[in-house]
Structure formats: C-alpha cells, structure tokens
Amino acid sequence: MIVGLIGVVEKISALETHIEVQGVVYGVQVSMRTAALLQAGQKARLKILQVIKEDAHLLYGFLEEGEKILFERLLKINGVGGRIALAILSSFSPNEFENIIATKEVKRLQQVPGIGKKLADKIMVDLIGFFIQDETKPMHNEVFLALESLGFKSAEINKVLKTLKPSLSIEAAIKEALQQLRS
C-alpha cells in the first residue's frame, strides 16, 4: 500500500498531478488548494490515500494530514465519492469546512459542484458529530471513528459521546461507549 510520496512534481493539471519518484511517475489526484501550493520542477512530499476499485487504482494526495482524514471521512458517506470529496477540499480548508458543519450552513455546502440539497443535508447529518468544538475533540474523534467502523450509526454515536467523561482514555471511552450502545 502506498501511504506517501516524495518526489519532483512534473505536471500539475486540474485532473491529475504527476510526481516522479526515482524514475517512476505517479498520477495523483489532488484538490485545487493542494495543486495551487505545488510547483512544477520542485520537490514535494504528499500523504497518499490509495483507493483500489474494480476498474481503477487511484492515488489521492494531500499536503496536510487533516485534509487526508477529512477526505477519508467524506468517502464513508453514501453518495460522496472521490470527485465530490476533492471538490469539497478544493472549495474549503478543513477548518472552514468544520465551521460550515458546526454552523449548519447547508447553502454554502450546496455551492460545491456536484452537491445538491439532498446530499448537502446528508453530509451535515453524517458529519455533525465528527467535529466536536471542545477540549475532548481528539478523544471524541477517535471514539467516533472506532464505533463507526464497528457499524454503529452517527446519530447513536453522537448521543453516547455526549455522556462520556472527558477524563477517560480513548480505550476506556470506547469500552464505555460500547457498553452504552449494546444496552
């Protein structure tokens, strides 16, 4: 699995960026924001998400870990694929997007190409608990992702997250949340 690339940027286009790494040129899909920060002929270090489908092997590149985490979370939403997730990251920084979700600005989300009212509403509902605005944020995000990977719904997880003590370790919080969800 490819998780990162360090090489020289050969070509930057709206569809794909080419990076040469020790004689091999990789086609990497990046957001417009990332593309704007890259320069042809310059060395770049990208965090990579490799997506293997029936008909394609895709590489998505990110300069920041926060962008990659948000992209991965967006892909988990039914109806959001790589194209729409990149369009969101091209339109908003992760912090801007977090504020849009926190303030429930559906109209701003609908300005992204490919996102209509129905999908914007779905994204809002699915991500409302992903961004927690307090000191327990790192713990809540880890617990949220762990519970989601076990098949629990966002609404159920958000309800339980509100009851967890901030002093719990991530492991203890997951155990406590599982007990509450299974009761």
Curated annotation (Swiss-Prot):
InterPro entries: DNA_helicase_Holl-junc_RuvA_I (IPR013849), Hlx-hairpin-Hlx_DNA-bd_motif (IPR003583), NA-bd_OB-fold (IPR012340), RuvA (IPR000085), RuvA_2-like (IPR010994), RuvA_C (IPR011114), RuvA_C_sf (IPR036267). Has three domains with a flexible linker between the domains II and III and assumes an 'L' shape. Domain III is highly mobile and contacts RuvB. The keyword Lipid biosynthesis does not apply. Signal peptide: none annotated. Homotetramer. Forms an RuvA(8)-RuvB(12)-Holliday junction (HJ) complex. HJ DNA is sandwiched between 2 RuvA tetramers; dsDNA enters through RuvA and exits via RuvB. An RuvB hexamer assembles on each DNA strand where it exits the tetramer. Each RuvB hexamer is contacted by two RuvA subunits (via domain III) on 2 adjacent RuvB subunits; this complex drives branch migration. In the full resolvosome a probable DNA-RuvA(4)-RuvB(12)-RuvC(2) complex forms which resolves the HJ. Residues 64-141 are annotated as: Domain II. Pfam families: HHH_5, RuvA_C, RuvA_N. Residues 141 are annotated as: Flexible linker. The gene is ruvA. It is found in: Cytoplasm. Belongs to the RuvA family. The RuvA-RuvB-RuvC complex processes Holliday junction (HJ) DNA during genetic recombination and DNA repair, while the RuvA-RuvB complex plays an important role in the rescue of blocked DNA replication forks via replication fork reversal (RFR). RuvA specifically binds to HJ cruciform DNA, conferring on it an open structure. The RuvB hexamer acts as an ATP-dependent pump, pulling dsDNA into and through the RuvAB complex. HJ branch migration allows RuvC to scan DNA until it finds its consensus sequence, where it cleaves and resolves the cruciform DNA. GO terms for cellular component: cytoplasm; Holliday junction helicase complex; Holliday junction resolvase complex. One of its GO terms (molecular function) is ATP binding. This is Holliday junction branch migration complex subunit RuvA. Residues 1-63 are annotated as: Domain I. The keyword Transferase does not apply. Its main location: cytoplasm. Residues 141-183 are annotated as: Domain III. Keywords: Cytoplasm, DNA damage, DNA recombination, DNA repair, DNA-binding. It comes from the Bacteria. GO terms for biological process: DNA recombination; DNA repair.
